[in-house]
Amino acid sequence: MLYRRLLLGVVASALWLGADISPSSAQTTRDSSSATGLETVIVTARKRAEDAQEVPISISAFNQDELTKLDVLTIQDLKTVSPSVYVQPTAFRQDTLNVTIRGQRNFDSPSGGGNPGLAFDTASAVYKDGVYYARAVGLGGTLFDIDSLEVLKGPQGTLVGRNTTGGAILYTTRQPGDTFGGYVTSTLGDYGRAGIQGAVDIPLTDTLFARVALNADDQRGYISNHYSDPVSGASNSQPSMGSDRLGGIFSLKWQPDDTFNILFRADIAAEHDTGSTYHDLNEFVGTVKSLGRASVCNIPAACSGFTDLLGHPVAPTFLTVNANTATGLNPSSAAYNSVLNSLAREQTYGFWSTEQAVSNVDAGHYQTYSAIANKNFGDIDAKWMAAYRTWNSTGTAVSRGQPFATNIYTYDTPNYQSWQSELTVNGSAIDDKLKWTTGLFYFTERSPDDGGMLDLFSTNAGSAPSSAKQITVTDWSKNSERNSSYAAYAQATYSIWPDTRITAGVRYTYDERFASIHSQTILTPATATTNNTLIAAGKPAVFSSTPYVINGISYAGQSDLCFLTDANGHILPQTGCAADISKSYHKPTYTLALDHDLWEGTMVYATMRSGYRSGGINTQSINIAALTALPEEVQDYEIGAKSDFSLIGMPVRANLALYQTAYHDIQVQEMVPNVTVATAAGGGPCTQTALNAGQCINNFNDNITLNAKKARIYGAEWEVTALPTDWLTLKAAGSYIDPWFTDFTFVAPPGYLQPANANLSGTPIPVPRWQTNETATINFGATDVGIPLGDTLFTAHYYWQSRYLADMRGFDPSQRTFAYGMLNLRLDFTDVGRSGADLALFMNNVANTQACLPEYNGTLNSVPNPTFGSAGTSGVTQCIPLPPRMTGIQATYHF
């Protein structure tokens, strides 16, 4: 309660201050930007061009110049400049981003292997040039040739495309101009960074204009890989977190007169990444024993060896083991790649290092074709958009920064396709007192191969793969999905008085979802005897003597099983291994807002709105009864103030927002032990007791989809800009969030066992509680240092975030994330030698701060992953390092 009183006090104080320094006249003038010297920022959050200071919701807006100076190269970087926004790649894939706005998140991935599929919609959507990017895959590309970028906070359930509960990111690229001209920019920097981008406007006739924008950038990974195997001679020196990106936007605009234009765009992109990885931080030792041995034996290859899926033997770290201790270091070269030995070496390499046997590479190719037509009919403007998007994506996810391969996830989405269309009509009436918008929206998508394959071999098997210690292969690659959405919406703003307006809007959405599921499991090596054992245990396996090949290694025999169960957790026979699921969901959502001009340049507002996210079908779940999840619903309340004023002659812009969100049926993923094909170490069933004692083989943690009943989120956002002098600009922005599950208990469905913590009521939604960013820009003006210069600008930008909120009950304290801050500096020289050329020097992460990306649940990862979140076990804490200090130079030529 205290923080709410403080925040309300801040708002009240700001309004009082504004009243004290503002003109006493009650006459309202809405456009005060020119009077204060502050730039007017135009946004399209309500489907029409408006001053951002006049829109009654929280918005962050940027142009290309601002993004460049703040080093916002991709959507992921928006977390450093926009309050309440947090973006990071999923655990295994650089090309797939989890966008979080106001604590509402996308899934990391249904499988845990990095393939998000079409199972569930995003909580915070991304729209490029009006086209809805429904999937998180492919969002990691470079932002270039940007005209404007807007981040809308809170539910966008009325006007902005598909329903989103957290918010939306809208960005548009530049349209063709009517005169010839353009620019080219080249960049060189650390870690082999090299990039070039540019654009050119080409007027073809008096009414037909073209624009071509191209981008190519490449950078070597900043995490060095030191993997080598002295026994086999294998090695991997591929640095992680590197990328090679290409992109092109080809635009053609026809404008025969002032009332009509049509714009065609072809947006082509390709991305090849060297993959994410993990750095080992430290060892922690618990009290829970591992198969009756010392707890440290829970760490892979600490007390027992194995042969991995590459055929490389890994010997144990310790030679002498009993129920309480593990001693005597193993001198064998085969023990070189045990986890504990690898951990020790990584401490000597430094923070930005790993030893990963196989890189988590990914590659994607993306194409988007769109047409937007605008027609003016006097007081009415009509806009029609149609788009087609297709992409393919492939990759590999292997372990987590480990010097062996015991789980290999391969994914291939060869032919994703989506079609969408939207008609929007804007109008005004009653002498412009009433402004209205109405529209229709359609979207459909399909993916014929919506899954991947997971090869898994337990490190506690204590041997090479055999019919007694089998590899589990799970095949989701034959699954397919199709989703469609239809919506109609209308919204109007009416000026009750010259200084007071009311806005009301409604949207009705109807969603259809279909999935055809044919998941399979293969156990190999296998014999007729081991197959009969499965059958006797009620698992209808089909034996084949055909060898199964993994990474060029042939394993004798295989048992084929269906990876679907009935509602009671019994595996379906191969002859009936299919499930076609159709679901439909529908929901009305609304917006209601009241805004009032207190005085010139100062608006206060109150907005109430609802949001909805469609239910979904998890094609990688095993239990037919647990395949679907209900839709999410949110009820959001926001109050705020937007003010442009002068303080002792200094122009100031201050925007403040407070919000409260009631969140119902939250779609969440929980790591739950999958024991469908698992056995105890002695060959019996993998029971809850055996699992808790660490005595199961062929079990693995699976992400199942659930609906948490209720959560509540309180938060605040602020953005302040001040111009103390004509050569200094100061900006400060930030957010505070207090998100908690208020009712979240669950029982694992049949085929799974209960995790350590099944009651999450009262636990936080994992996000940073505080995020702040500050920017100072100094314009030294025109100078002459032997050659004439235009403006010389120095920009310093600092981002800070608190540690992640997380439920730490099942984790070691070393797995808690930590707060960090990063400082970026940039020096720009414009119009060098009056040639139209600009030059810039930059340095990011000046202090070389060591910082980590957390896991989906807000903690740092641990090895072994199957005990992730199990209290009292032993492990090695890991993290994905954020970039180190990087410097570079950039040159731009305008023509």
What is each of the regions a protein language model found here?
Residues 1-80, 369, 685-690, 695:
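N-terminal Sec signal peptide and the immediately downstream disordered periplasmic leader
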Residues 38-178, 639:
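Acidic, small-polar-rich N-terminal luminal/periplasmic segments of exported/outer-membrane proteins
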Residues 121-123, 135, 142-153, 158-248, ...:
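Outer-membrane beta-barrel translocator/receptor signature
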Residues 178-179, 187, 201-305, 354, ...:
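Periplasmic-side early beta-strands and strand-to-turn transitions of outer-membrane beta-barrels
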Residues 253-255, 425-426, 435-443, 479-661:
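Structural signature of Gram-negative outer-membrane beta-barrels, strongest in the C-terminal barrel
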Residues 372, 376-377, 383-387, 392-397, ...:
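Membrane-embedded beta-barrel scaffold of Gram-negative outer-membrane proteins
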Residues 498-502, 655-662, 681-807, 890-892:
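Gram-negative outer-membrane beta-barrel transporters
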Residues 662, 669, 727, 788, ...:
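C-terminal beta-signal and adjacent terminal beta-strands/loops
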